């Protein structure tokens, strides 16, 4: 009797599990449809792939000292810089993150890469390719499955020749393979063979940014976080860099493109996430930027009006409503 009871219970459990799986699949499919109703760039191959990178309810605060108080009497306080932030990058797409300076775009990049300051408090959930990540997991991904194109060229080691630095981003390859890969990328970005022997201080600003792009692409990552990758590049090279991101995404990878250049972003992105005051105020399809009536947030509409093709037509009142304040008050001292 016990064996039969167990068999019956197992059958009931299997039936319940099957029903739950079907319900989950239907819900997941419905959610996927909601996520993928948007249109894409003309060159996009994105057709509703799964989440490669998913951030949910991200909150970041810093423990600061009140700089207005006398030095030895300053009290600590928590300054919230990101709050309730959720964003996702699907396989095969580019998500452009735009917004005013100080809106939290670079802090998002730091959080995704697990680059946490000692005085920071970070809560929320981050998944990479379906796997929940902790700080250790994000650290292991950096430079491999997840690559950064940093905002500042100071990320280059001033004491190491450029060629060796770039090749160091693909240690899994043989020495000959690393060299061949680096030479291929250098040729792509107009960097001559002699650049490999230069030190970072011998590079122009544009050359240094191209070197950073090569570093990010060396190890064939699944997701690239590009933090302002085009300043210092002339228009042709900037377009080529973004086209490479588009090709990278079309191969089933993902790009989180953080930029102030909305025009270039709209050229290659699938979706745009608009940042203001430490969170995403609107996430919309690129096609919706063709008509401000399709944009729901006043700040997003202000960005639309400020585009050159609209004659920088943002009014003073709109600008005042849409302006983003600095996130950390007066550059307070860290704890």
Give the positions of each predicted feature:
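Q-loop/switch helix immediately C-terminal to the Walker
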Residues: 158-171
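C-terminal boundary and immediately downstream tail of ABC-type ATPase nucleotide-binding domains
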Residues: 2-3, 36-40, 191, 291-335
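A short, proline-enriched helix->beta-strand linker immediately N-terminal to the Walker B motif
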Residues: 218-222
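Conserved ABC ATPase "signature" region
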Residues: 179-194
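Conserved ABC ATPase signature
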Residues: 199-203, 207
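ABC ATPase NBD coupling module
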Residues: 132-147, 172, 289-295
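ABC ATPase C-loop
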Residues: 211, 216-217
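H-loop/switch region of ABC-family ATPase nucleotide-binding domains
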Residues: 259-260
């Amino acid at each position: 009797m016990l064996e039969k009871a167990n068999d019956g219970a197992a059958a009931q459990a299997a039936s319940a599990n099957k029903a739950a799986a079907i319900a989950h699949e239907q819900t997941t499919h419905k959610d996927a449809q909601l996520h993928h109703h948007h249109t894409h760039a003309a060159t996009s191959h994105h057709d509703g792939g799964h989440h490669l990178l998913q951030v949910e309810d991200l909150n970041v605060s810093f423990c600061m000292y009140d700089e207005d108080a006398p030095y030895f009497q300053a009290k600590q306080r928590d300054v919230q810089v990101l709050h309730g932030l959720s964003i996702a990058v699907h396989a095969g797409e580019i998500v452009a993150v735009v917004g005013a300076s100080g809106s939290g775009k670079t802090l998002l990049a730091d959080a995704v890469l697990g680059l946490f300051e000692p005085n920071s408090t970070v809560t929320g959930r981050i998944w990479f390719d379906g796997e929940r990540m902790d700080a250790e997991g994000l650290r292991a991904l950096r430079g491999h499955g997840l690559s950064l194109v940093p905002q500042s060229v100071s990320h280059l080691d001033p004491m190491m020749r450029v060629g060796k630095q770039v090749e160091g981003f693909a240690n899994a390859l043989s020495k000959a393979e690393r060299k061949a890969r680096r030479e291929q990328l250098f040729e792509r970005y107009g960097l001559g063979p002699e650049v490999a022997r230069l030190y970072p201080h011998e590079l122009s600003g544009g050359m240094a940014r191209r070197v950073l792009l090569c570093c990010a692409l060396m190890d064939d990552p699944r997701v690239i976080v590009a933090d302002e990758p085009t300043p210092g590049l002339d228009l042709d090279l900037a377009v080529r860099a973004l086209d490479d991101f588009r090709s990278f995404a079309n191969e089933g990878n993902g790009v989180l493109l953080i930029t102030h250049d909305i025009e270039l972003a709209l050229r290659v992105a699938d979706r745009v996430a608009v940042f203001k005051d430490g969170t995403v105020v609107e996430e919309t399809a690129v096609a919706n930027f063709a008509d401000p009536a399709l944009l729901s947030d006043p700040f997003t509409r202000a960005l639309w009006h400020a585009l050159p093709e609209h004659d920088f037509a943002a009014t003073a009142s709109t600008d005042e409503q849409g302006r983003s304040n600095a996130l950390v008050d007066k550059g307070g001292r860290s704890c």
